[in-house]
Amino acid sequence: MARFHFDCVFYYVRDIEKAISFYSEVLSLRLTSRDVVARFDIDGVLFELIPTRDEGKLRGDGNARLCLKVDDIDDTVQYLKTKGTHADEIQKVENGKLTSFEDPDGNEVYLWQYD
């Protein structure tokens, strides 16, 4: 029987330099390596940015989303505003609070604060 192991989460991006800047400077993610692909480590999970010119891959309308856990969603949303990033209205859900925003390529990123 085949065995599967988690490898990574990735987003296609139009401008790799702009995307690296957004994820490293705005979201404070640590860039761990860079060749054609930019790689970040998020609590032991590999997150990659892959440059492409294929507009079909840049639609950002797939089902996969990056979801980042935060301690204080209200403070985080205020911080994002200072960086020019607008988050949607914070929603109260059964086990916490949730909001989302888009990266420079229209990929949706979620913020989650657990109760």
Predicted region positions:
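Conserved short beta-strand elements that form part of the metal-binding/catalytic scaffold
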Residues: 30-62, 108-114
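Vicinal oxygen chelate
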Residues: 1-2, 81-115
